[in-house]
């Protein structure tokens, strides 16, 4: 499948995978890509498959000359689902913001190398973390 930008989807998936353990291929559809980061374990006592994590997820949409994004912070529960949940611990929020910024920088650099822009979605008004200079 070729995206509106003219780039083959399979090649983009390969490049996105090289950015780190963020892309969830099974949740990518058509010209949309899904990334997430399990940044902070809520409680290490349960068995690994039962653990919950604080983290973020990002949806990326391919358009002709750019990719647009929207992201959320929240909880990745033991069923493997993301839920928007307020996070009250400063250290956790700082870690999530750091990992999101790091990923955003790598993603932006990759897209620039392909002569594509990375911008917030037109309807994404809730940008709590400053990602671009």
UniProtKB/Swiss-Prot annotation:
* Positions in coiled-coil regions: 90-111
One GO cellular component term of this record is: cytoplasm
Q: Which GO terms describe its biological process?
A: positive regulation of cellulose biosynthetic process; positive regulation of DNA-templated transcription
Entries under InterPro entries matching the protein = Tscrpt_reg_Crl, Tscrpt_reg_Crl_sf
Q: What induces it?
A: Induced at late exponential and stationary phases, and at low temperatures.
Q: Where is this region: Essential for activity?
A: 99-122
What are the entry keywords? Activator, Coiled coil, Cytoplasm, Transcription, Transcription regulation
Location comes to:
Cytoplasm
Q: Which family does it belong to?
A: Belongs to the Crl family.
The job of this chain, per UniProt, is described as: Binds to the sigma-S subunit of RNA polymerase, activating expression of sigma-S-regulated genes, such as the csgBAC operon encoding the subunits of curli proteins, and BcsA, involved in cellulose biosynthesis.
Q: Provide the protein name.
A: Sigma factor-binding protein Crl
* Gene responsible for this protein: crl
């Amino acid at each position: 499948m070729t995206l509106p930008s003219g780039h083959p989807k399979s090649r983009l998936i390969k490049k996105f995978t090289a950015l780190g353990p963020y892309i969830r291929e099974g949740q990518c559809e058509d010209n949309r890509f899904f990334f997430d980061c399990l940044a902070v374990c809520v409680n290490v006592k349960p068995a690994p498959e039962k653990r919950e994590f604080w983290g973020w997820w990002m949806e990326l949409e391919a358009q002709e000359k750019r990719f647009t994004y929207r992201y959320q912070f929240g909880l990745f529960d033991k069923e493997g689902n993301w839920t928007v949940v307020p996070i009250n611990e400063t250290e956790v929020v700082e870690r999530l913001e750091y990992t999101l910024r790091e990923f955003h920088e790598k993603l932006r650099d990759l897209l620039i190398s392909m002569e594509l822009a990375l911008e917030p979605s037109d309807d994404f008004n809730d940008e709590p973390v400053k990602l671009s200079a």
